[in-house]
Structure formats: structure tokens, C-alpha cells
UniProtKB/Swiss-Prot annotation:
Homotetramer. PROSITE patterns: ADH_ZINC. One of its GO terms (biological process) is L-threonine catabolic process to glycine. The record marks D148 as: Important for catalytic activity for the proton relay mechanism but does not participate directly in the coordination of zinc atom. Catalyzes the NAD(+)-dependent oxidation of L-threonine to 2-amino-3-ketobutyrate. This is L-threonine 3-dehydrogenase. The lineage of its organism: Bacteria, Bacillati, Actinomycetota, Actinomycetes, Kitasatosporales. Zn(2+) 1 binds at C38, H63, E64. Pathway: Amino-acid degradation; L-threonine degradation via oxydo-reductase pathway; glycine from L-threonine: step 1/2. It comes from Streptomyces griseus subsp. griseus (strain JCM 4626 / CBS 651.72 / NBRC 13350 / KCC S-0626 / ISP 5235). Zn(2+) 2 binds at C93, C96, C99, C107. Keywords: Cytoplasm, Metal-binding, NAD, Oxidoreductase, Zinc. Binds 2 Zn(2+) ions per subunit. InterPro entries: ADH-like_C, ADH-like_N, ADH_Zn_CS, GroES-like_sf, L-Threonine_3-DHase, NAD(P)-bd_dom_sf, Zn_alcohol_dh. It comes from the Bacteria.
Length: 342
């Protein structure tokens, strides 16, 4: 089969012929239809400092995908050949305290698909049946391919009740934009998103944010005044990992405000902890998706009319992966899709 492989410990990816993966009695063999390119994949392609520590070559990368079940193991139930499926990219041990308590997203032994084991940038991928999500209702293939990052957005956005709340989102990357769409759909009063990229702020406007604010030119306080917010934001969703974004978020929260933080900082940084304490602000770290409450929520949101189409800005055949990765790395668009059927 064809696969995109990190063949060498150096920058680049290689489209190669590799053996089809074998599957065991509790596994599912999936014919990949479409995949999404993630920031993690860009790091692996560039072979930066993180990738050098995290990845062992050779490796088939990729963890955002949709596919059709090609075969199932002898012990697999409730999944059938021909089912349309996506996959949870965090593989857990199933034996630790958190896993046994049903908190699998908190497993201390999580292995990442396409990082710690061969992934989905290939014609076929194998996953444990427990990591396979069957789409029981019709879903657009491009959207099904990005259920992994969509899940990050949903997990973050729905960390706190949103109805009637004023929400600040720092970082208008694809996940930030999806989180904005979710917050709007879930009943937030005002949704403000910030970035320094006009191209991405334009995408955010397409999902119905109240204000898309370029913080290179204006401050968050300016945005508050424009919307008539006198007491600050109720909910903060930090998606950028930028120290200045987190500091500005803390400075613009109301007393008792709640912050969900998905953005991963590159290094340690200082924040105004005195303000967090005296304003009684809650800060919650978010990583991945809750298994499988987040997946259920994603499906229900889409059934209820949530429109993520503006987030998809590029589609390429898998043989054009270099152009697709360049597009994704430009930082100018949304999600980029690779089609494995052409």
C-alpha cells in the first residue's frame, strides 16, 4: 500500500510502498478515505526539536482520518465491514486507575497514533476496536476526517456552561475557529476571537463570531468596549499557547471567570497569579478528547446544524502531499484535507 512515511531522521516525508498492516482479534482494519493535516504532522515533517525527541523512524504519520471498515478481528462486536468510521488517536492502556474509572483521556500511558505508532497517512490503518468511532448518522467526509481536532475544540469549548456567557477565544487557528462555532451554537451571548492573522480572522467571521479582533492593531479591552462589556469575559478559551495571549486573557476576565487552556506553550512563562487568586479565576488544562463523551457531543452538534464547512480551505490528492503540507504550514488557511481515493 501507499503511505506517507518519516523514513529518515531529517526534514521531509517520503511517499512509499509499505506492507498492509496486520490486525488482531480485537482490531479493525480501515481503508482510509480522507485525512486531515495537523500541526503535529508539520512538526514531524520539519523534524524540529520536539519531533526529534518524540518520533522514532521509520514512522507512518497521521492521526486525523475517516475511512471505511475493511475487516474486523474475530472478537470485535458492534462494528461491521463497510461502516464509515473515524478514530480516536489516543491509545490508552485500559488498566490504570483512570482507565478503569472510565476517565480514559487521563491515562498516563497514552500512545499517539501517527506519533508513537504507525498512523493513518496510508491506504489502510489498524486500530483497536475500542478506538473506532462509527458514524451512525450521515456526515460529510471532510468533516469526519477532522473529528480529532474538532473534538479538541468541543472538549475545550464545552468545559464550562456557555449559555448567555461572554466568551473570549485567543488564537484563530482551525481549532480556535471550530471552538468559536461551537460556543456560538451552544448559546454563548458574545464570542470574541483574537489573532494577528487577518486571513484566519476572516475565516472566523464566517462561523459567526461577534468580533474577530486583530491584536496587532487593537487590544482586547478595545473589543470589550465595542461590545459594551463592562465586567469582562465569563469564559476564556486559550488556543494559541502564546504567553501574551494567556496574560491578556487573565487581565480581561470577570471575577469568577473560567479559562480552558488547550494551547500548548513552547516554554514556561509568568502569569498574574495574584489576579487569578483574588479574582477567583478557574484555569483548566485540556488535552485531547473525553472518550467518548466528546465524540457523542460532536455528532449531536453536527446533527443539530453546526456548520464547520468554512474551516476546510484546501483539498489535495495524497500524491500532492508536498503542496498540501506547504499550504497547511503557511498559516493562512484552515484545515487541509488529503484524499486517499484519487
Amino acid at each position: 500500500m501507499k503511505a506517507l512515511v518519516k523514513q529518515k531522521a531529517e526534514p521531509g516525508l517520503w511517499l512509499m510502498d509499505v506492507p498492509e498492516p496486520e490486525y488482531g482479534p480485537t482490531d479493525v482494519l480501515i481503508k482510509v478515505l480522507r485525512t486531515g493535516i495537523c500541526g503535529t504532522d508539520l512538526h514531524i515533517r520539519a523534524y524540529d526539536g520536539w519531533a526529534q525527541q518524540a518520533v522514532t523512524t521509520p514512522l507512518i504519520l497521521g492521526h486525523e482520518f475517516v475511512g471505511e471498515v475493511a475487516a474486523i478481528g474475530s472478537d470485535v462486536a458492534d462494528i461491521a465491514t463497510g461502516d464509515l468510521v473515524s478514530g480516536e488517536g489516543h491509545l490508552v492502556c485500559g488498566k490504570c486507575r483512570n482507565c478503569l474509572a472510565g476517565r480514559r483521556h487521563l491515562c498516563r500511558s497514552t500512545v499517539g497514533l501517527g506519533v508513537g505508532r504507525d498512523g493513518a497517512f496510508a491506504e489502510y490503518v489498524v486500530l483497536p476496536a475500542s478506538n473506532v468511532w462509527v458514524h451512525r448518522v450521515p456526515v460529510d467526509l471532510d468533516i469526519a476526517a477532522i473529528f480529532d481536532p474538532f473534538g479538541n475544540a468541543v472538549h475545550t469549548a464545552l468545559s464550562f456552561p456557555l449559555v448567555g456567557e461572554d466568551v473570549l477565544i485567543t488564537g484563530a487557528g482551525p481549532i480556535g475557529i471550530m471552538a468559536a462555532a461551537v460556543a456560538r451554537h451552544a448559546g454563548a451571548r458574545n464570542v470574541v476571537i483574537t489573532d494577528v492573522s487577518e486571513a484566519r480572522l476572516a475565516l472566523a467571521r464566517k462561523v459567526g463570531v461577534s468580533l474577530a479582533l486583530n491584536v496587532a492593531d487593537r487590544t482586547i479591552a478595545d473589543g470589550q468596549r465595542e461590545l459594551g462589556l463592562r465586567e469582562g469575559f465569563d469564559i476564556g478559551l486559550e488556543m494559541s499557547g502564546r504567553p501574551e495571549a494567556m496574560r491578556e486573557m487573565v487581565a480581561n476576565m470577570t471575577h469568577g471567570g473560567r479559562i480552558a487552556m488547550l494551547g500548548l506553550p513552547a516554554e514556561e512563562f509568568a502569569v498574574d497569579w495574584a489576579r487569578i487568586v483574588t479574582s477567583m479565576i478557574t484555569v483548566k488544562g485540556i488535552y485531547g478528547r473525553e472518550m467518548y463523551e466528546t465524540w457523542y457531543a460532536m455528532s449531536v452538534l453536527l446533527e443539530g446544524g453546526l456548520d464547520l464547512a468554512p474551516v476546510i480551505t484546501g483539498r489535495y490528492g495524497y500524491r500532492d502531499f508536498e503542496a498540501a503540507f506547504d499550504d497547511a504550514a503557511s498559516g493562512l488557511g484552515g484545515k487541509i484535507i488529503l484524499d486517499w481515493t484519487v
